[in-house]
Amino acid sequence: MKLIFVSNYFNHHQLPFCDALYELLEGDFCFLQTQPMEEERVKMGWQAEERPYVRYAAKNSCAYKSGGEKTPGSESNSNAVTGAEDFEKLLFTADVVIFGGCDDESYIQERLTAGKPIFRYNERLYKEGQWKAVSPRGLLQKYKDHTRYRKAPVYFLCAGAYVPCDYHLIHAYPGKMLRFGYFPETRHYEAGQPFNHKEPGSILWAARMIDWKHPELVVKTASYLKEHLEENTFHITMIGGGELEEETHRLAEELGVTDVITFPGFQGPEEVRAAMEKSEI
């Protein structure tokens, strides 16, 4: 069985899962990356190790046009670049395609028209609130992308607990939504580990500092705890950065909580996981 996984870029969230597919399918697996990784995510350490099954679609990547300079997160091996005709053939002839993290529907349009099996995956439709579901223009686009395939062999892998609720609103994928997610490396710990190494009162927040992640709520929580606890028996570490980073730092200063919050900036996946293992919350 030939399986193709299409997404915007290959990163540490998908690496263990893709390694397992490559092994289980005895090499009949390909990950097709559709665009170079943004500089911000490169700084976050999202670049995954090179893998033989990763291919880069030249369709949307200026890094491979006219011999141009490669962009951050792009593959150094030019042999891994898959031209338009090649990736169209890959996507059409594969037994199964997993498609998500990419807004360009043209990658799978021919396959959808032919009625071939596709597993779409994504996070929530309405991260900023389900009130957006009333937009006529938005509903028309959701119908074109999702609802009209409700009886076709198109299934949905839900990367989040609230994803089904959003897609129920647009009457898409009835009885065809499955639990999915991001798959970090499985680690086996000895009895009691890592819980007996937790730092007392430690709280960790790790994310990009953008509006719908609400980093300001963590700072306000620190202010509330500092005001209501008899002793400051807690400390918050906020790993990450982004467009709201300076604003979040200013808020911490205004609320007088810089003594109970640490801002280490972006860290790589291994560092973030180590911090999680040490944190109580």
Name what the model sees in each region.
Residues 85, 126, 135-156, 165, ...:
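Membrane-proximal helix-turn-helix segments that form the acceptor-binding/catalytic region
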